């Protein structure tokens, strides 16, 4: 802690050897005021041991004096440092030496030990420890619907909406709404549809009807702002069409003059017909006018019809809507409802820039240009979560209706799913395995089957349908197809090679087969996976796996509709397709169910192999003849 003692004799030799005339050319080294005692001081330090022992009895007083002396020594040292800038002298060095000696005499060994103990105590007191989180108030949230794998990362477009949850227990009779619905409307619902609601219908009617009826009685002008916009994410076949149709008809039921007050936008012509049928049944016995606009009709004739007789409700596709807006066939001045069905598909495709065009006309045509002047209802089984696309709709106080689950998409409650794993070595016989699987279905199903098969492309649909027809024509020669030998099998394909009339006829025959039909099979692409309401589809088969969980939801949603039983079968070839399907399952809610593996005892005999080979050869000849023709 203190400097070693200084010997003046050591400086005489260098000073004597210095040349004459030069004084203090080399500045002396600055010796610190306090240094730790070196081993050379041990002998002299021992001579003062007696005085140190006496100082131990009054250590506190010595410490006070030491602090005073230490302060004085610091002042002296500052003076010494100022003098060191001048030529050094022996007297300066000796005075510093004496100061050091006097301090060492006053400071005993026990004081040094105590100072070290104090330093160690201070070190212990200043030791670091693990950081602890400051207590925070509990965050109020819904644990059933805040899963980090789904909503936090995939549903950013819904973060600013009011969420309203429902579950499968929300089923009630429509008669409970007798005080909220017009008597004629309630009669049409119970007569043409059902006496009980579906869960999504219950939650929407409970949330909208009381506010809607109260606001209409007070002020019809501002009722749209009291309701706000609505986003609905519900499984296919859950009754979404009826859910948005009932509030519309209830609002327009007592209108005096027909004006365009509702536009319903759907992606396909087939869905136009389906929605039109629903609204026609709901509006029976009323003066409401429901019209459609689609590509099959002449644009000129539609323009003339809409100009002469303005409808209350218009059902159309986005492209045809843009055509009529450009031709000024319709005016949005009195529009109160805008319904977008299958919204994820419509918002993912431009369709002549229909969304910006429509929003622009809403601003220019309507006298009331403030937000919330139109109630927008957005429906889909796989509602988009893209913030940019939802922002283009200019939503006003949106409410999100979704099922109480931690998954992104919901499957029908009464859907049963099965996986048929096909080894890679047997993938060449996949069409034959498909027919064999259908044989197994029929062995446990005494009723007629209506089977919808999805493939990846239009060409696959054409080839597979023809190949299955050729195999079934000679199925009596096969051992694996023995269950099909006594049944009538009808196989058709919906594809772009057919005319619109042919495809329409094929779909109609599939929807309403004859009483003698045993198995009716329709092979199609994803064009029929959305919005097509065909009753009594018993099985859906994914011959080619879907590309996303959205496609899977829409495909299997063609069965198990309206709370009826249905089955879905997935043909998976090799480990790669099985792994891909497992990834799709992460976004799907099955209400506690799981996909069951279906083991098939597929033993291929020589006769089956010969039948399959001959069918492939016949298919090749058929395509060659078709190409030449």
UniProtKB/Swiss-Prot annotation:
GO terms for cellular component: nucleolus. One of its GO terms (biological process) is rRNA processing. Residues 221-401 form the Helicase ATP-binding domain. Its main location: nucleus. Residues 1-130 are annotated as: Disordered. Keywords: ATP-binding, Helicase, Hydrolase, Nucleotide-binding, Nucleus, Phosphoprotein, Ribosome biogenesis, RNA-binding, rRNA processing. InterPro entries: DEAD/DEAH_box_helicase_dom, Helicase_ATP-bd, Helicase_C-like, P-loop_NTPase, RNA-helicase_DEAD-box_CS. Residues 88-103 have a biased composition (Polar residues). A motif (DEAD box) lies at residues 341-344. Residues 72-84, 116-125 have a biased composition (Acidic residues). Residues 437-603 form the Helicase C-terminal domain. Coiled coil: none annotated. It catalyses: ATP + H2O = ADP + phosphate + H(+). One of its GO terms (molecular function) is ATP hydrolysis activity. ATP binds at residues 234-241. The modification Phosphoserine is found at residues 73, 77-78. It is found in: Nucleus, Nucleolus. Belongs to the DEAD box helicase family. DDX51/DBP6 subfamily. The Q motif is unique to and characteristic of the DEAD box family of RNA helicases and controls ATP binding and hydrolysis. Associated with pre-ribosomal particles. Interacts with DBP9 and RSA3. Together with NOP8, URB1, URB2 and RSA3, forms an RNA-independent complex, which is required during early maturation of nascent 60S ribosomal subunits. ATP-binding RNA helicase involved in the biogenesis of 60S ribosomal subunits and is required for the normal formation of 25S and 5.8S rRNAs. This is ATP-dependent RNA helicase DBP6. It comes from Saccharomyces cerevisiae (strain YJM789). The lineage of its organism: Eukaryota, Fungi, Dikarya, Ascomycota, Saccharomycotina.
């Amino acid at each position: 802690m203190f400097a070693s003692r200084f010997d003046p004799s050591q400086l005489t030799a260098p000073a004597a050897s210095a040349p004459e005339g030069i004084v203090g050319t080399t500045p002396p080294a600055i010796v610190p005021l306090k240094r730790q005692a070196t081993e050379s001081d041990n002998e002299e330090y021992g001579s003062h041991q007696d005085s140190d022992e006496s100082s131990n009895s009054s250590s506190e007083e010595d410490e006070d004096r030491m602090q005073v002396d230490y302060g004085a020594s610091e002042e002296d040292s500052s003076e010494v440092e100022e003098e060191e800038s001048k030529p050094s002298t022996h007297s300066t060095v000796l005075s510093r030496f004496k100061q050091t000696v006097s301090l060492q005499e006053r400071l005993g060994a026990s004081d040094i030990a105590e100072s070290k103990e104090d330093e160690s105590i201070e070190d212990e007191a200043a030791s670091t420890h693990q950081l602890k989180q400051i207590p925070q108030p509990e965050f109020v949230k819904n644990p059933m619907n805040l899963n980090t794998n789904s909503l936090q990362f995939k549903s950013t477009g819904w973060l600013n909406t009011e969420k309203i949850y429902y579950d499968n227990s929300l089923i009630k009779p429509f008669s409970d709404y007798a005080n909220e619905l017009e008597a004629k409307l309630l009669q049409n619902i119970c007569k043409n549809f059902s006496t009980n609601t579906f869960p999504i219908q219950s939650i929407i009617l409970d949330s909208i009807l009381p506010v809607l009826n109260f606001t209409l009685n007070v002020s019809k002008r501002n009722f749209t702002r009291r309701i706000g916009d609505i986003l609905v994410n519900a499984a296919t076949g859950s009754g979404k069409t009826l859910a948005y149709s009932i509030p519309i008809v209830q609002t327009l039921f007592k209108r005096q003059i027909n004006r365009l007050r509702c536009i319903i936008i759907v992606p396909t012509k087939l869905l136009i017909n389906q929605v039109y049928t629903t609204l026609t049944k709901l509006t029976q016995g009323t003066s409401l006018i429901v019209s459609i606009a689609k590509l099959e009709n002449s644009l000129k004739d539609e323009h003339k019809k809409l100009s002469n007789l303005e409808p209350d409700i218009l059902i159309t596709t986005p492209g045809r809507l843009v055509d009529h807006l450009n031709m000024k066939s319709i005016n949005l001045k009195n529009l109160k409802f805008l319904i977008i069905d299958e919204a994820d598909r419509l918002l993912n495709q431009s369709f002549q820039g229909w969304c910006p065009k429509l929003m622009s006309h809403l601003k220019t045509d309507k006298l009331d240009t403030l937000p919330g002047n139109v109630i927008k209802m957005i429906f889909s089984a796989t509602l988009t979560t893209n913030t940019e696309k939802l922002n283009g709709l200019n939503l006003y106080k949106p409410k999100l209706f979704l099922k109480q689950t931690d998954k992104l998409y919901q499957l029908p409650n009464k859907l049963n799913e099965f996986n048929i794993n096909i080894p890679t070595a047997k993938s060449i016989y996949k069409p034959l395995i498909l027919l064999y699987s259908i044989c197994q279905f029929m062995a446990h199903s005494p009723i007629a089957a209506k089977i919808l098969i999805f493939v990846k492309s239009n060409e696959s649909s054409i080839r597979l349908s023809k190949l299955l027809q050729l195999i079934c024509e000679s199925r009596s020669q096969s051992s694996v197809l023995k269950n099909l030998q006594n049944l009538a099998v009808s196989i058709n394909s919906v594809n772009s090679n057919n005319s619109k009339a042919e495809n329409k006829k094929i779909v109609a025959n599939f929807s309403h087969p004859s009483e003698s039909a045993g198995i009716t099979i329709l092979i199609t692409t994803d064009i029929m996976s959305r919005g097509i309401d065909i009753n009594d589809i018993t099985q859906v088969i994914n011959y080619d796996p879907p590309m996303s969980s959205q496609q899977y939801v829409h495909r299997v949603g063609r069965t198990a509709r309206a709370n009826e039983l249905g089955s879905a079968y997935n043909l998976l070839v090799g480990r790669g397709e099985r792994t891909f399907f497992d990834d799709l399952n992460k976004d799907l809610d099955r209400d506690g169910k799981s996909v069951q593996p279906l083991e098939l005892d597929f033993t291929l005999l020589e006769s089956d192999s010969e039948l399959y080979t001959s069918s492939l050869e016949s298919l090749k000849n058929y395509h060659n003849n078709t190409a030449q023709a």
